[in-house]
Amino acid sequence: MPYRKFSRPTNHRRALLRNITTSLLKHGKIVTTEPKAKELRRIADKMITLGKQGDLHARRQALAFIQEESVVTHLFKEIAPKYATRQGGYTRVLKAGFRRGDAAPMCIVELV
């Protein structure tokens, strides 16, 4: 399956995606660049789907990716039940203009 490489080594890219996924689930909304936002949307939807499954195996899979146990608890107890009837599309990506320093396209990623 194709994915974005972000001009980073595998470990750095994986750590970046883990960090921004954890931040999104913790705060509900983050601002990042457009390519990162589009990749984050894929991963965040997978994590919320794990939360909807709700069993021990899904919880351990989420803990293997999300860095904070409190965020996993929040995901399974508060976020996942909110999307119980929704079949995917748990995140929204809104364009937020361009960053001043380097004119990178920015986006707001939020939970629907």
Curated annotation (Swiss-Prot):
A GO term for molecular function: structural constituent of ribosome
Disulphide bridges: none
Pfam families xrefs: Ribosomal_L17 (PF01196)
GO cellular component, one term: cytosolic large ribosomal subunit
Gene Ontology terms describing biological process: translation
Keywords: Ribonucleoprotein, Ribosomal protein
NCBIfam families referenced in this protein's UniProt entry, alphabetically: L17
Family: Belongs to the bacterial ribosomal protein bL17 family.
Subunit architecture: Part of the 50S ribosomal subunit. Contacts protein L32.
Protein name as it appears in the record: Large ribosomal subunit protein bL17
Organism: Heliobacterium modesticaldum (strain ATCC 51547 / Ice1)
